Protein backbone atom coordinates (compact mmCIF):
# COMPACT_ATOMS: atom_id res chain seq x y z
CA UNK A 1 0.00 0.00 0.00
CA UNK A 2 1.24 3.48 -0.88
CA UNK A 3 0.36 6.76 0.81
CA UNK A 4 0.31 10.22 -0.78
CA UNK A 5 0.37 13.51 1.11
CA UNK A 6 0.50 15.90 -1.85
CA UNK A 7 -2.92 16.33 -3.48
CA UNK A 8 -3.08 16.26 -7.30
CA UNK A 9 -5.87 17.87 -9.32
CA UNK A 10 -7.47 14.45 -9.86
CA UNK A 11 -6.93 11.28 -7.85
CA UNK A 12 -7.09 8.10 -9.96
CA UNK A 13 -6.45 4.49 -9.04
CA UNK A 14 -7.39 1.18 -10.62
CA UNK A 15 -9.30 -0.82 -8.02
CA UNK A 16 -10.90 -3.43 -10.27
CA UNK A 17 -14.61 -4.04 -10.88
CA UNK A 18 -15.29 -5.12 -7.27
CA UNK A 19 -12.64 -3.13 -5.42
CA UNK A 20 -13.07 -0.87 -2.40
CA UNK A 21 -13.33 2.91 -2.09
CA UNK A 22 -13.34 4.86 1.17
CA UNK A 23 -13.83 8.64 1.32
CA UNK A 24 -14.11 10.61 4.58
CA UNK A 25 -14.31 14.41 4.52
CA UNK A 26 -15.59 17.08 6.85
CA UNK A 27 -17.83 19.49 4.98
CA UNK A 28 -17.71 18.72 1.26
CA UNK A 29 -20.71 17.46 -0.70
CA UNK A 30 -20.02 14.10 -2.36
CA UNK A 31 -21.43 13.22 -5.78
CA UNK A 32 -20.85 9.60 -6.83
CA UNK A 33 -21.50 7.94 -10.19
CA UNK A 34 -20.51 4.67 -11.83
CA UNK A 35 -17.31 4.80 -13.88
CA UNK A 36 -17.05 3.38 -17.42
CA UNK A 37 -14.06 1.22 -16.41
CA UNK A 38 -12.46 -0.25 -13.27
CA UNK A 39 -10.77 2.98 -12.17
CA UNK A 40 -11.85 5.13 -9.22
CA UNK A 41 -11.51 8.89 -9.83
CA UNK A 42 -11.93 11.77 -7.41
CA UNK A 43 -11.80 15.44 -8.38
CA UNK A 44 -13.26 18.75 -7.39
CA UNK A 45 -16.56 19.36 -9.17
CA UNK A 46 -16.93 22.33 -11.52
CA UNK A 47 -13.17 22.87 -11.66
CA UNK A 48 -12.77 23.27 -7.91
CA UNK A 49 -9.42 22.35 -6.41
CA UNK A 50 -9.25 19.33 -4.15
CA UNK A 51 -8.70 19.98 -0.43
CA UNK A 52 -4.98 20.40 0.22
CA UNK A 53 -5.00 18.24 3.36
CA UNK A 54 -6.17 14.95 1.86
CA UNK A 55 -4.44 11.75 2.87
CA UNK A 56 -4.53 9.21 0.03
CA UNK A 57 -3.80 5.49 0.38
CA UNK A 58 -3.67 3.16 -2.62
CA UNK A 59 -3.94 -0.61 -2.22
CA UNK A 60 -3.97 -3.46 -4.72
CA UNK A 61 -7.74 -3.20 -5.09
CA UNK A 62 -8.57 -0.23 -2.88
CA UNK A 63 -8.43 3.55 -2.62
CA UNK A 64 -8.81 5.48 0.63
CA UNK A 65 -9.11 9.27 0.86
CA UNK A 66 -9.35 11.09 4.17
CA UNK A 67 -9.09 14.56 5.69
CA UNK A 68 -7.19 13.69 8.89
CA UNK A 69 -7.06 17.25 10.22
CA UNK A 70 -10.79 17.82 9.69
CA UNK A 71 -12.10 14.30 10.35
CA UNK A 72 -10.22 13.07 13.44
CA UNK A 73 -12.53 10.21 14.36
CA UNK A 74 -15.80 8.48 13.67
CA UNK A 75 -17.81 11.25 15.30
CA UNK A 76 -19.37 13.93 13.16
CA UNK A 77 -18.63 17.65 13.17
CA UNK A 78 -22.04 19.25 13.64
CA UNK A 79 -22.95 22.76 12.58
CA UNK A 80 -20.54 23.16 9.66
CA UNK A 81 -21.83 23.69 6.15
CA UNK A 82 -20.42 22.50 2.87
CA UNK A 83 -20.66 25.96 1.30
CA UNK A 84 -21.13 24.62 -2.23
CA UNK A 85 -17.87 22.65 -2.33
CA UNK A 86 -18.28 19.28 -4.01
CA UNK A 87 -16.20 16.23 -4.78
CA UNK A 88 -17.09 14.39 -8.00
CA UNK A 89 -16.36 10.68 -7.60
CA UNK A 90 -16.44 7.95 -10.23
CA UNK A 91 -16.25 4.36 -9.04
CA UNK A 92 -16.91 0.95 -10.66
CA UNK A 93 -20.61 0.17 -10.30
CA UNK A 94 -20.08 -3.05 -8.30
CA UNK A 95 -17.33 -1.72 -6.04
CA UNK A 96 -17.76 -1.60 -2.26
CA UNK A 97 -17.93 2.01 -1.07
CA UNK A 98 -17.75 3.64 2.34
CA UNK A 99 -18.26 7.41 2.17
CA UNK A 100 -18.75 9.89 4.99
CA UNK A 101 -19.18 13.65 5.13
CA UNK A 102 -19.74 15.38 8.44
CA UNK A 103 -22.04 18.11 7.13
CA UNK A 104 -22.16 17.73 3.36
CA UNK A 105 -24.83 16.15 1.19
CA UNK A 106 -24.17 12.79 -0.46
CA UNK A 107 -25.64 11.75 -3.82
CA UNK A 108 -25.02 8.47 -5.66
CA UNK A 109 -26.27 7.27 -9.03
CA UNK A 110 -26.10 3.82 -10.59
CA UNK A 111 -24.08 2.02 -7.90
CA UNK A 112 -24.77 -1.69 -7.35
CA UNK A 113 -22.25 -3.00 -4.81
CA UNK A 114 -22.05 -2.81 -1.01
CA UNK A 115 -22.67 0.83 -0.14
CA UNK A 116 -22.23 2.58 3.22
CA UNK A 117 -23.11 6.27 3.20
CA UNK A 118 -23.08 8.46 6.27
CA UNK A 119 -23.54 12.16 7.04
CA UNK A 120 -24.64 14.16 10.06
CA UNK A 121 -26.55 17.21 8.86
CA UNK A 122 -26.52 16.61 5.11
CA UNK A 123 -29.10 14.87 2.93
CA UNK A 124 -28.59 11.47 1.28
CA UNK A 125 -29.95 10.72 -2.20
CA UNK A 126 -29.48 7.47 -4.11
CA UNK A 127 -30.77 6.96 -7.64
CA UNK A 128 -30.82 3.70 -9.63
CA UNK A 129 -29.52 1.92 -6.52
CA UNK A 130 -29.01 -1.84 -6.19
CA UNK A 131 -26.98 -4.18 -3.98
CA UNK A 132 -26.67 -3.85 -0.20
CA UNK A 133 -27.14 -0.27 0.97
CA UNK A 134 -26.61 1.18 4.45
CA UNK A 135 -27.39 4.86 5.02
CA UNK A 136 -27.18 6.98 8.15
CA UNK A 137 -27.84 10.63 8.91
CA UNK A 138 -28.81 12.68 11.95
CA UNK A 139 -30.92 15.58 10.69
CA UNK A 140 -30.82 15.10 6.92
CA UNK A 141 -33.43 13.46 4.71
CA UNK A 142 -32.80 10.13 2.95
CA UNK A 143 -34.16 9.33 -0.52
CA UNK A 144 -33.54 5.97 -2.22
CA UNK A 145 -34.62 5.20 -5.76
CA UNK A 146 -34.22 1.47 -6.40
CA UNK A 147 -33.41 -0.08 -9.77
CA UNK A 148 -33.53 -3.85 -9.67
CA UNK A 149 -33.28 -5.19 -6.11
CA UNK A 150 -31.70 -3.89 -2.94
CA UNK A 151 -31.10 -4.87 0.67
CA UNK A 152 -31.57 -1.72 2.73
CA UNK A 153 -30.63 -0.48 6.21
CA UNK A 154 -31.58 3.11 7.06
CA UNK A 155 -31.02 5.10 10.24
CA UNK A 156 -31.92 8.73 10.89
CA UNK A 157 -32.93 10.86 13.85
CA UNK A 158 -35.11 13.70 12.56
CA UNK A 159 -34.87 13.34 8.79
CA UNK A 160 -37.61 11.92 6.57
CA UNK A 161 -37.09 8.74 4.53
CA UNK A 162 -38.42 7.89 1.06
CA UNK A 163 -37.84 4.57 -0.74
CA UNK A 164 -39.40 3.93 -4.14
CA UNK A 165 -39.06 1.79 -7.25
CA UNK A 166 -37.61 -1.67 -7.80
CA UNK A 167 -37.74 -4.39 -5.18
CA UNK A 168 -36.55 -4.22 -1.58
CA UNK A 169 -35.47 -7.73 -0.61
CA UNK A 170 -35.08 -6.78 3.05
CA UNK A 171 -35.25 -3.52 4.96
CA UNK A 172 -34.43 -2.35 8.47
CA UNK A 173 -35.44 1.27 8.92
CA UNK A 174 -35.07 3.21 12.17
CA UNK A 175 -35.95 6.85 12.79
CA UNK A 176 -36.77 8.92 15.85
CA UNK A 177 -39.08 11.67 14.58
CA UNK A 178 -38.80 11.44 10.80
CA UNK A 179 -41.61 10.17 8.57
CA UNK A 180 -41.24 7.15 6.29
CA UNK A 181 -42.63 6.50 2.81
CA UNK A 182 -41.96 3.06 1.31
CA UNK A 183 -43.45 2.38 -2.12
CA UNK A 184 -41.11 -0.32 -3.46
CA UNK A 185 -42.17 -3.92 -3.92
CA UNK A 186 -41.19 -5.98 -0.89
CA UNK A 187 -39.22 -9.21 -1.18
CA UNK A 188 -39.14 -12.11 1.30
CA UNK A 189 -37.61 -10.02 4.11
CA UNK A 190 -37.05 -9.70 6.96
CA UNK A 191 -38.61 -6.22 7.03
CA UNK A 192 -38.74 -3.87 10.03
CA UNK A 193 -39.68 -0.22 10.55
CA UNK A 194 -38.96 1.37 13.93
CA UNK A 195 -39.84 4.92 14.96
CA UNK A 196 -40.39 6.93 18.10
CA UNK A 197 -42.87 9.54 16.84
CA UNK A 198 -42.44 9.27 13.08
CA UNK A 199 -45.26 8.00 10.85
CA UNK A 200 -44.94 5.47 8.03
CA UNK A 201 -46.76 5.01 4.72
CA UNK A 202 -46.48 1.71 2.88
CA UNK A 203 -47.81 1.10 -0.64
CA UNK A 204 -48.66 -2.47 -1.54
CA UNK A 205 -51.22 -4.51 -3.45
CA UNK A 206 -49.59 -7.79 -2.44
CA UNK A 207 -50.14 -9.96 0.60
CA UNK A 208 -48.89 -8.35 3.81
CA UNK A 209 -48.84 -9.32 7.46
CA UNK A 210 -47.88 -6.42 9.71
CA UNK A 211 -47.15 -7.00 13.38
CA UNK A 212 -47.14 -3.75 15.35
CA UNK A 213 -45.93 -2.94 18.84
CA UNK A 214 -46.89 0.63 19.68
CA UNK A 215 -47.86 2.70 22.69
CA UNK A 216 -49.99 5.51 21.29
CA UNK A 217 -49.71 4.89 17.56
CA UNK A 218 -52.20 3.39 15.13
CA UNK A 219 -52.21 0.81 12.33
CA UNK A 220 -54.44 1.43 9.29
CA UNK A 221 -55.08 0.08 5.79
CA UNK A 222 -57.01 1.53 2.86
CA UNK A 223 -57.08 -1.98 1.35
CA UNK A 224 -59.38 -4.83 2.45
CA UNK A 225 -57.80 -6.40 5.51
CA UNK A 226 -58.29 -8.20 8.77
CA UNK A 227 -56.85 -7.12 12.10
CA UNK A 228 -56.59 -8.43 15.62
CA UNK A 229 -55.11 -7.46 18.92
CA UNK A 230 -55.62 -4.35 20.99
CA UNK A 231 -53.76 -1.34 22.36
CA UNK A 232 -50.03 -1.96 22.42
CA UNK A 233 -49.85 -5.03 20.18
CA UNK A 234 -51.77 -5.43 16.94
CA UNK A 235 -51.55 -7.31 13.68
CA UNK A 236 -52.99 -6.42 10.28
CA UNK A 237 -53.28 -8.80 7.32
CA UNK A 238 -53.77 -7.69 3.71
CA UNK A 239 -54.47 -10.42 1.15
CA UNK A 240 -52.73 -13.71 1.88
CA UNK A 241 -50.27 -12.13 4.34
CA UNK A 242 -47.31 -13.72 2.58
CA UNK A 243 -44.86 -10.88 3.29
CA UNK A 244 -44.21 -10.06 6.95
CA UNK A 245 -43.21 -6.66 8.32
CA UNK A 246 -42.50 -5.66 11.91
CA UNK A 247 -43.51 -2.15 13.03
CA UNK A 248 -42.44 -0.72 16.38
CA UNK A 249 -43.21 2.82 17.49
CA UNK A 250 -43.97 4.86 20.57
CA UNK A 251 -46.50 7.25 19.02
CA UNK A 252 -46.12 6.92 15.25
CA UNK A 253 -48.75 5.51 12.89
CA UNK A 254 -48.41 3.11 9.96
CA UNK A 255 -50.82 3.22 7.03
CA UNK A 256 -51.04 0.79 4.09
CA UNK A 257 -52.23 2.39 0.85
CA UNK A 258 -53.15 1.12 -2.60
CA UNK A 259 -50.42 1.73 -5.22
CA UNK A 260 -53.09 3.39 -7.37
CA UNK A 261 -52.77 6.32 -4.97
CA UNK A 262 -49.26 6.93 -6.30
CA UNK A 263 -50.63 7.99 -9.68
CA UNK A 264 -53.14 10.55 -8.50
CA UNK A 265 -51.27 12.51 -5.87
CA UNK A 266 -53.24 11.16 -2.92
CA UNK A 267 -50.21 10.04 -0.93
CA UNK A 268 -49.85 12.32 2.10
CA UNK A 269 -46.35 13.30 3.21
CA UNK A 270 -47.27 12.53 6.80
CA UNK A 271 -50.13 11.02 8.70
CA UNK A 272 -52.38 13.11 10.85
CA UNK A 273 -51.67 12.40 14.52
CA UNK A 274 -54.24 10.17 16.18
CA UNK A 275 -55.17 11.00 19.74
CA UNK A 276 -54.38 8.32 22.25
CA UNK A 277 -57.38 6.59 23.78
CA UNK A 278 -56.13 7.51 27.21
CA UNK A 279 -54.29 10.73 27.85
CA UNK A 280 -51.09 10.56 29.88
CA UNK A 281 -52.53 13.41 31.98
CA UNK A 282 -55.04 10.92 33.41
CA UNK A 283 -52.43 8.38 34.44
CA UNK A 284 -51.30 7.96 38.02
CA UNK A 285 -48.26 10.04 38.93
CA UNK A 286 -45.97 7.02 39.36
CA UNK A 287 -46.88 5.62 35.93
CA UNK A 288 -46.27 8.99 34.29
CA UNK A 289 -42.92 9.31 36.06
CA UNK A 290 -41.91 5.85 34.84
CA UNK A 291 -42.99 6.76 31.30
CA UNK A 292 -40.79 9.88 31.36
CA UNK A 293 -37.81 7.87 32.61
CA UNK A 294 -38.20 5.42 29.71
CA UNK A 295 -38.51 8.19 27.10
CA UNK A 296 -35.50 10.05 28.49
CA UNK A 297 -33.44 6.86 28.39
CA UNK A 298 -34.45 6.42 24.76
CA UNK A 299 -33.56 10.02 23.93
CA UNK A 300 -30.13 9.73 25.56
CA UNK A 301 -29.34 6.47 23.76
CA UNK A 302 -29.25 4.31 26.90
CA UNK A 303 -31.89 2.03 25.36
CA UNK A 304 -33.06 1.46 21.79
CA UNK A 305 -36.51 1.74 20.23
CA UNK A 306 -37.25 -1.96 20.66
CA UNK A 307 -36.54 -1.93 24.40
CA UNK A 308 -38.41 1.35 24.86
CA UNK A 309 -41.57 0.07 23.20
CA UNK A 310 -41.43 -3.17 25.19
CA UNK A 311 -41.09 -1.25 28.47
CA UNK A 312 -43.88 1.17 27.59
CA UNK A 313 -46.18 -1.66 26.51
CA UNK A 314 -45.52 -3.44 29.80
CA UNK A 315 -46.22 -0.21 31.68
CA UNK A 316 -49.55 0.27 29.90
CA UNK A 317 -50.47 -3.37 30.46
CA UNK A 318 -49.86 -3.03 34.19
CA UNK A 319 -51.89 0.19 34.23
CA UNK A 320 -54.87 -1.44 32.49
CA UNK A 321 -54.80 -4.57 34.65
Indicate where each model-derived feature is located.
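Intrinsically disordered, low-complexity terminal regions
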Residues: 1-321
Amino acid sequence: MTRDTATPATIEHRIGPTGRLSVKVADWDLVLASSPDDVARVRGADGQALPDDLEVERGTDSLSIRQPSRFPGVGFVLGAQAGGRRLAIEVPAHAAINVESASGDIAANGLRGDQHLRTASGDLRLDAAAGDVTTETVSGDISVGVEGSVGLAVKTVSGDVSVEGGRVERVRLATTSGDVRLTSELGPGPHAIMTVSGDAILLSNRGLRITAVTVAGDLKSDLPHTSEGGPGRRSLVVGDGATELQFRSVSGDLRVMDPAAAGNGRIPTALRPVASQQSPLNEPDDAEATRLVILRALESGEIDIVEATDRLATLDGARDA
